[in-house]
Amino acid sequence: AGQFERADKITTDNRVLFHRVANTLNYLDIRTVVVSCGTCYDQLQGYRFEDIFPGCRIVDIHEYLLEKGVTLPDQGAGYLYHDPCHSPMKLQEPMKTVQALLGPHVLKNDRCCGESGTLGVTRPDIATQVRFRKEESIRSGEAALRARMAQAGAPAAADVKILTSCPSCLQGLKRYEDDLSSGLLEADYIVVEMARRLLGEDWLPAYVARANAGGIERVLV
């Protein structure tokens, strides 16, 4: 199943656009393409970026941050981590990367979130049943995390966040926020949580202001 001919055309059109970007920005030495989505990462691997941007590599944003030494200070914060089916983290076991970025108080939360790409839209009957099991896993994960934090002498958080690295999973996890009223659940991206803690609550408008003031290259293709 799948629209393979249409997918191939989209891939070809995108590669043409990337070649135009490379020609327009030929005064820049582009060595790294940073990706934040596992599905996009897998697809872009077939684009042959090394032929478009000579010597270029594709790297996941979490592994790139770790490579650059950007991590959160250990202030006792604890998180649940939902590992997506299509993880963008390729260099080592994802939990090692997540704990290196966020600190030791991170627990992996198992089971599918129920979104599964478009499953939550195309088959809500199945997705709802999957979400029931995931909700049980979240509740038990919350209890386990709070117990671990207490044992470590870390301050108890009023809210427990569940973080992920997948746009589709984040959409799925957001569906639990209205169902879980025990201080859980707030779902977000790992990198957004890191930006909030390292740069402050106003990190996004500050970034947009800097980008609009000349912090990005604008390319007409």
Model-derived segments and spans:
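Iron-sulfur cluster-binding electron-transfer modules in prokaryotic oxidoreductases
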Residues: 1-221
